[in-house]
Each structure stands twice: as structure tokens, then as C-alpha cells.
Amino acid sequence: MGKTRGMGAARKLKNHRRRQRWADKSYKKSHLGNEWKKPFAGSSHAKGIVLEKIGIEAKQPNSAIRKCARVQLIKNGKKIAAFVPNDGCLNYIEENDEVLIAGFGRKGHAVGDIPGVRFKVVKVSGVSLLALFKEKKEKPRS
């Protein structure tokens, strides 16, 4: 059986198409409004305050402690875990520092062997973490 045909078929075709749209992943994502319930609430970056520095164990078969920070977002008070990239960059971050957080690259999913961490630290006290790591800039004295 194919599509309904004929002069009086428009309503049936229109309703069918409207119902079938919900099977499309991108349509569902844009129309359900779930983007506003996520920690960033639709934006690409967010500022937050570091609550504590934490180490998260990597998933099997890897064995490591990935350095992360527990951050409370300023815009809505939500607490998230954010990965601190590069070797030794956790030393540039202190508790109560203001950090800029970005997504981690898999559209809201955890990356690699770090379970439950969907964000990464980009800036600390207004200075790029990469610039601090390469020693091109210094962290401002607070």
C-alpha cells in the first residue's frame, strides 16, 4: 500500500507527515525544547566558579586519573564536572576561580574514557588556559 491519492487526500497526507516528523532526530531536538533544560541552556560557553578540584578514574581498559574541576555555573547555579586539558594545567586553577567552560566535542556526550564529563575548561580568570600552559601569559593576581 502506498500513499493516499486523490483530491480529498490532503488532510490525511498532511497529518501523516506531521506525525512522521517526530521520528527525525534533528526535528525532535529543535522542537521539544530540551536545549533549555541542559546546563548551558542553549549557549556554547558559560562562566562558573570552581568549587573543588577532582580526579575522575578513566574507564576500562585505561588506567588513569583524569584531572577535572567541579564548577558551579553563574547563570543558573547548576553544578557540573569540567575536564582540565593538558599536562599540569590543574595547577593554574584554584578554588573560587572564575572559569569559562565549553562543550567537549560530542554534542552533549562524554568524550573518550572520562565517564560523565561533558565539558572542558577554556579560560581561568579571563586568561586562556592554553596561554598559561605555553607560558605566554600569566594569571592575574587576585
UniProtKB/Swiss-Prot annotation:
Q: Where are stretches of biased composition, namely Basic and acidic residues?
A: 21-30
Q: Which of UniProt's keywords are assigned here?
A: Hydroxylation, Ribonucleoprotein, Ribosomal protein
GO terms of molecular function: structural constituent of ribosome
Please name the Pfam families in this protein's record.
Answer: Ribosom_S12_S23
The terms describing its cellular component in GO are: small ribosomal subunit
PANTHER family attached to this UniProt entry: 30S RIBOSOMAL PROTEIN S12 FAMILY MEMBER (PTHR11652)
Task: Provide the family line.
Answer: Belongs to the universal ribosomal protein uS12 family.
The name on file for this protein is: Small ribosomal subunit protein uS12
